[in-house]
From Swiss-Prot:
Keywords: Acyltransferase, Cytoplasm, Iron, Metal-binding, Transferase, tRNA processing. It holds the Pfam family TsaD. Substrate binds at residues 138-142, 172, 185, 189, 277. This is tRNA N6-adenosine threonylcarbamoyltransferase. GO terms for biological process: tRNA threonylcarbamoyladenosine modification. Its EC number is 2.3.1.234. Its cofactor is Fe(2+). NCBIfam families: gcp_kae1, T6A_TsaD_YgjD. It comes from Mycobacterium ulcerans (strain Agy99). Binds 1 Fe(2+) ion per subunit. Required for the formation of a threonylcarbamoyl group on adenosine at position 37 (t(6)A37) in tRNAs that read codons beginning with adenine. Is involved in the transfer of the threonylcarbamoyl moiety of threonylcarbamoyl-AMP (TC-AMP) to the N6 group of A37, together with TsaE and TsaB. TsaD likely plays a direct catalytic role in this reaction.
C-alpha cells in the first residue's frame, strides 16, 4: 500500500477513538478507518463525565477498537503511531498514551504526541484540503477559543477565550435545568428546532463596547436561563432551548467573523464538538457569506472526539518532517491550545 500509514489514538475524555489515515505523496489524506467507542451512557446517571469511569471504559474499549480499525483499514501495522497527549482527563489520557507508546515500541515505528485541540483543527483537512491561514473558533465541552492560525505547523496565537464556562459546558448545564439530562448538546439542538428563537431574548455576554471583542462569557447566560425558568413555571421548553441556542450562536459567530475581518484573514474555521450544532453552522454560513469569508466546518462526525483528527495532525507533522516525540514524554492534562506537538 503506497503512502505513509498513520494510526492515532484518542482518549482525552469519554470517547475511545482509533483513526488510521494514509498520507499520500502529494500531501493529501485518505481516511482508512475511524473507530469510536463512547462511554457516554455510563455517565448519564451522574449528569456528567466521571473520570474514573471514563478511564476504565477506555481500558475495556481500546483493544477491540484497535482490532476493528486495523481490520477495516486492511493493514497489519502502521508506519507511524500518534496519540492525544493532552489536554484532557488525567487518567483517560494515560490509557491512550501508554497504549500508543507500547504499540510504537512493539512495531518499531515513530511516535508522535499530539495536542487534542490541534487535532480538532486538523480534522477539517479531510473535508476541505490543506488549511490556509485562518481564524479558528474552537468550541467544545471544555474549551472555547478564538485562534489565529497561520498554518498547522506554526504556533497558534490565542486571540481570546471564555472567561468562565465553555460553550459546550453551558449547553450541558442548561439541559439539566430543563430536565433533559446529559449530554445536553444534541438534545437541546433538537428541541430548539420546534421553538421560537425570538420568543425569549436572553443576554449576550461580553458584547458591550468596553468588553474584550475576542473573549466569551456564558455563565451569565446560564444564570439568565435559570432565573427565567424559575420565574415562569409554565415556560415552553422548546422556546427556552431556541432562545438559549440563538444567544450562543449569535455571540460565537459575531465575534469570530469580527476577528477574521479585523485581521484581514479570509477564512474562518469552526471546530470542536459544538461545531456540530445546527444553528451555529447555519448562522456562521449566513454571516460568513455576508462578510465575504470562506467558512470551513468539518462534517458533524469529525467535530466530536475521534482518532481520525489526531491522525490528521500527525500526518501534517510527518509531511513537515518534524522529529518524532520521545517515548518518555508525559501526558499533560493542562496542555495549552497553542502547542501542537509535544516532545
Amino acid at each position: 500500500m503506497p503512502g505513509t500509514i498513520i494510526l492515532a489514538i484518542e482518549t482525552s475524555c469519554d470517547e475511545t477513538g482509533v483513526g488510521i489515515t494514509r498520507l499520500e505523496a502529494d500531501g493529501t489524506l485518505t481516511l482508512l478507518a475511524d473507530e469510536v467507542a463512547s462511554s457516554v451512557d455510563e455517565h448519564v446517571r451522574f449528569g456528567g463525565v466521571v473520570p474514573e469511569i471514563a478511564s476504565r471504559a477506555h481500558l475495556e474499549a481500546l483493544g477491540p477498537a484497535m482490532r476493528r480499525a486495523l481490520t477495516t483499514a486492511g493493514i497489519v501495522r502502521p508506519d507511524v503511531v500518534a496519540t492525544t497527549i493532552g489536554p484532557g482527563l488525567a487518567g483517560a489520557l494515560l490509557v491512550g498514551v501508554a497504549a500508543a507508546k507500547a504499540y510504537a515500541a512493539a512495531w518499531g515505528v515513530p511516535f508522535y504526541a499530539v495536542n487534542h485541540l490541534g487535532g480538532h483543527l486538523a480534522a477539517d483537512v479531510y473535508e476541505h484540503g490543506p488549511l490556509p491561514e485562518c481564524v479558528a473558533l474552537l468550541v467544545s465541552g471544555g474549551h472555547t477559543h478564538l485562534l489565529h492560525v497561520r498554518s498547522l505547523g506554526e504556533p497558534m496565537v490565542e486571540l481570546g477565550a471564555t472567561v468562565d464556562d465553555a460553550a459546550g459546558e453551558a449547553y450541558d448545564k442548561v439541559a439539566r435545568l430543563l430536565g433533559l439530562g446529559y449530554p445536553g448538546g444534541k438534545v437541546l439542538d433538537d428541541l430548539a428546532r420546534s421553538g421560537d428563537p425570538d420568543a425569549i431574548v436572553f443576554p449576550r455576554g461580553m458584547t458591550g463596547p468596553s468588553d474584550d471583542p475576542c473573549a466569551f462569557s456564558f455563565s451569565g447566560l446560564k444564570t439568565a436561563v435559570a432565573c427565567y425558568v424559575e420565574a415562569h413555571p409554565d415556560f415552553r421548553p422548546a422556546d427556552v432551548a431556541a432562545g438559549f441556542q440563538e444567544a450562543v450562536a449569535d455571540v460565537l459567530t459575531r465575534k469570530a467573523v469580527r476577528a477574521a475581518t479585523g485581521l484581514g484573514v479570509s477564512t474562518l474555521l469552526i471546530a470542536g464538538g459544538v461545531a456540530a450544532n445546527s444553528r451555529l453552522r447555519e448562522l456562521a454560513t449566513q454571516r460568513c457569506s455576508e462578510a465575504g469569508l470562506t467558512l470551513r466546518i468539518p462534517r458533524p462526525r469529525l467535530c466530536t472526539d475521534n482518532g481520525a483528527m489526531i491522525a490528521a495532525f500527525a500526518a501534517h507533522l510527518v509531511a513537515a518532517k518534524a522529529a518524532p516525540s520521545p517515548l518518555d514524554v508525559p501526558s499533560d492534562p493542562g496542555l495549552p491550545v497553542v502547542k501542537g506537538q509535544v516532545g
